[in-house]
């Protein structure tokens, strides 16, 4: 999986911060999972050379305009491009009513079905390779963060070596792949580790869409295989702009301190 970070940008003239937006491109397929849909998202996709037609799932962390500004426009663009495949949106419950109101007053109809899923604590998407977990970032569960878990990959069984040792095909192949050991009648010792490659461990990818420091943010970063890079601003700069939506150097050091303490 490749994570594309649509980076934070501070607009000094308007004294405003654009929230972080992510796109996850799956390795096995050409699918793209979009996390949040900020304003001007179509232009961002064009600059990043990603194809918006490959979007199959959209995860919205909150109903604020900062998270959903580009969603109606993106869906309309997909309609104009002739999309027919369904798209799944994982969001708070009120987002469905918002989109229904947008289509009503703009007199727009989408050419593809939209499947809405209400966000709640726990696994939202579970497939053969990945699991997306949703975590509430506020007490009233109005804002959510996401964790992507890549499942471990079992080692490949070395069939050629088994045939070289004249091991008959059967249930013993499965046991050897599970790295069980056997002692043959002629005294030959079979080690399961010699018949399969090592298991590739899974990965944890944290997508802290709300970058304000909190305990849950530290837990999201705990044991992350690939922590997502976030812009770190000086504490004075963060206070000047918007302190509850920017990651300052003090907050970042606090997160690392929490993780080192738990480990």
Swiss-Prot record:
GO CC annotations, alphabetized: chloroplast
InterPro entries from the UniProt entry: RibonucZ/Hydroxyglut_hydro
Protein name: Uncharacterized protein ycf56
Organism: Pyropia yezoensis (Susabi-nori)
Annotated keywords: Chloroplast, Plastid
Main location: plastid
Similarity annotation: Belongs to the AtsA family.
GO molecular function ontology, one term from the record: 3'-tRNA processing endoribonuclease activity
Compartment annotation: Plastid, Chloroplast
